[in-house]
Amino acid sequence: MISYSVWRDLFENFDEENKKYSIGIFCKKNYDKDDDSGKQYCEQDSFFQVLIERGVSLGYKVFVFSELEGDKCVGYIPEGEGWKKINTDIPQCVYVRDPAMPSEKRDALFVKGVKFFNPDPVIDIANNKWKMYNVFKEHPLNLPFTQLWDKNFDIKKISEKFDIFYVKPVNGSMGQGIYSFKKKEDVWYCKYEDTEEKVDDLSDRINKVVETIREKFDDVLIQEGIDVQMYKESVFDVRVLMQKDKNGKNLLTGFNSRCGEPGKNTSNLHTGGYGKKTSEIVEEMYGEEKKSLIIEEIREISWKITHILDSISPFGEVGIDLLIDKKGKIYLIEINTRPGRSLFKIEKDIRKRSLERPIEYCGFLAKS
C-alpha cells in the first residue's frame, strides 16, 4: 500500500501544468460508523484502495467521495487502517460504485463538465430488465421470452406455452425477488429460494407473488424459463467482463462461471454460490470439441453486446450474464454496470486486470 505522504504530495502539487488529473469514486460511506477508522465502504474498501493505488502510480489524484459542496467535494483517502477526510476540487471523471447515485448529484456534476465512467443510457438499460429486453430483441441474440406484467396478463397462455417460467422484479439484483413456476406431471410448483410448494390455483398464486414483489420493487416481469444444463445439481451461468483500457479500447477482460447452491433458482455468489472456470465446466459437460465451439460463441456474443451498447453510449465496463441450455444454446440473461470482482479470484491475472482497467479508463476520460 502506498503511504499517505504520496497522496498528500499529489494533492498539494495538483495543477494542470503538471498534467495531473483527478478521479472520484462515488460511494456513500457506512454511516453506522461514527469515525473514519476501519472499513467505511463495506465489502468495497479493499477494492477502492487498489483503485487509488493504481491511480497514484499513474499520476492521478484519486479519492472516494459522496458529498458535494459547490465546486468542492468531501473526499476520503486511505490512511493506516482507516480513511482520512479531505476537502478537494470536484473530480474530472467519476466512477460510480454506489447502488444509487442521487440524480441531483449526477446532474450537478454533469453540468460542470464531469465525465462519467459509465453513462446514464447504459446504466438505465442494465437497471431495467424490460428495457434491456427491448433493446436486445432487435438484434440476432438468444433471449428468453419476456413480458411486462399488467392486470390483463394472460396467465393461461403463458402456462400453456412454457413448462417453466419466472416471475421477477424489473429492477431486482443479486437474485432477489425471483420466483420460479415449474410444471411436473401436469402439476404446477412454485419455488422461492429453498422452498418449493405445490400450486393449487396458478392464477391466484401468481397474483399473490406479484403483490409480494411489488412491496419492494417497481414493475414485474414474466420470463420464459430456460431448460438449463445443471452442473453437479447446481444452476450455473457465465459472467463475462468487458472493459475499456487506458486508450479507450474495448477489451474482453475475462469470464468465469457462477455455480449456485444446489436446489436454488439462482447462481448468485451472495446466496451461497461459488466460482469456477467456465472452460472446465463446459469441457466436463460437453466434451473437448464442443467446449471450443461454446467458448468461441461466448466471446462472439459478448462482443456483439458490447458493440450494441457502445453504439448507444460508450461505456467503461459491463458484466454480461449468459445461460447455456441443455442443447448448448447460449442466452443473454442480463447485464450489470457495477460488476463485482470476487468471481475472478480464481484467476489472478484476470482479477488484476479487472481492478486496474477502471482507473485507467477514467484517466483516459479525464484527459479527453
Placement of each model-derived feature along the sequence:
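Glycine-rich phosphate/pyrophosphate-binding beta-alpha loops
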Residues: 175, 258-266, 336-348
